[in-house]
Swiss-Prot record:
Organism encoding this protein: Rhizobium meliloti (strain 1021)
Keyword tags: NAD, Oxidoreductase, Plasmid
Keyword DNA damage set for record: no
Similarity annotation: Belongs to the ornithine cyclodeaminase/mu-crystallin family.
Molecular-function annotations in GO: oxidoreductase activity
Keyword tRNA-binding: no
A Pfam family: OCD_Mu_crystall
GO CC annotation terms, alphabetical: cytoplasm
Protein's UniProt name: Putative dehydrogenase RA1029
EC main group: oxidoreductase
UniProt-listed Enzyme Commission number(s): 1.-.-.-
Highest taxon in the source lineage: Bacteria
Length: 330
């Protein structure tokens, strides 16, 4: 047999955001239906001027594919010193029936795509139906990807954006308005942005509370993306006290996600977690039950999202004769 190699530009051509949203919905449902084996992911954090690298491994029983992803970020000196991007991703796909390596693909786009899609899936399930205004705390690549995904499933009338980096905020405003035609209002403070939100999206590498509880108005849906390791934090734990908390994985979010902080401070218990997003999508747990509810989606990211997304890309590549096959096994 031969192994397929897919480069970044090929991956980009092989899947669109609508397909990714479908793949992520499939992933969440599979995870909550005992169709997934997914060990705890591990990360290595380097000293200053370097970043972190995470490894995620997952087996999806329905498609008989095992995926393994390595994804790094925050290596700010990479372009100048090493001639490579500051964020690098690689995904390996194995046929679970033989454990033969069937595909090696660039994974740098997939992490951004499936993470953006996760926010959109939560908006479909948990945001108010009349939600129109988004607040973005953070204006980097993932903040853009969240808008790209949410824009697929609802009409965004305006975005209130805040960043601690003025240059990033300015680029975000220009890029979003040019690509989507959505007005972006530059907020003078985090508080100003949050108070306007029907949907609040946080995508920072924050190490402390960025969003205070009394800024969040009734009916807000919060998409908490940035916290996926101990030490990271974006939300005031008090927000969780009176919110409906939905997570991608109870096991991950209670140990490494935003939900760990209110648990650690005894503001909530594990019993206060409403459920996993897959349970909501399957109809086992209700989604939003009133227009006044504050809902939180805590997303730490799961290997099964990479699995279903990468598998779809692989299928599209085979169907369209894209990529390069090579003889990996003698």
């Amino acid at each position: 047999m031969k192994t397929l190699l897919l480069k970044k530009d090929e991956v980009r051509r092989l899947i669109g955001m609508a397909e990714v949203i479908g793949a992520v919905e499939e992933a969440y449902k599979a995870f909550s239906s005992d169709q997934v084996e997914q060990p705890d992911y591990i990360g290595i954090h380097h000293p200053s001027l370097r970043g972190e690298i995470d490894f995620k491994l997952g087996y999806y029983k329905a498609n008989e594919i095992i995926s393994m992803k390595a994804h790094s970020g925050g290596f700010t000196n990479n372009p100048a010193e090493h001639g490579v991007p500051n964020s690098i991703g690689t995904i390996l796909l194995f046929d679970a029936r033989s454990c033969a390596l069937i595909c090696i693909m660039d994974g740098s786009l997939i992490t951004g795509l499936r993470t953006g899609a996760s926010g959109a899936v939560s908006v479909k399930a948990l945001a108010r139906k009349n939600a129109r205004t988004v607040a973005s705390i953070g204006t980097g690549n993932q903040a853009r990807m969240q808008i790209r995904a949410v824009n697929e499933i609802m009409k965004i009338e305006k975005i209130h954006a805040w960043s601690r980096t003025p240059e990033s905020l300015s680029r975000y405003k220009t890029d979003i308005q040019r690509e989507f035609g959505i007005p972006v209002i530059v907020a003078s403070s985090k508080k100003e942005a949050v108070e306007q939100a029907d949907i609040l999206i946080t995508t920072t590498r924050g190490k402390g509370s960025l969003v205070e509880a009394d800024w969040v108005k009734p009916g807000t849906h919060i998409v908490a993306i940035g916290t996926d390791q101990r030490g990271k934090q974006e939300l005031d734990p008090e927000i969780f006290r009176n919110a409906k908390v939905v997570v991608d994985s109870v096991a991950q979010c209670t140990e490494k996600g935003e939900t760990w902080h209110p648990l650690n401070k005894n503001i909530i218990t594990k019993d206060d977690i409403h459920g996993e997003i897959g349970e909501v999508l399957l109809g086992r747990k209700p989604g939003r039950e009133s227009d006044d509810e504050i809902t939180i989606f805590d997303s730490t990211g799961m290997a099964i999202q990479d699995n279903t997304t990468a598998s779809k890309i692989y299928q599209n590549a085979i169907a369209n004769n894209v990529g390069t096959f090579f003889q990996f096994f003698e």
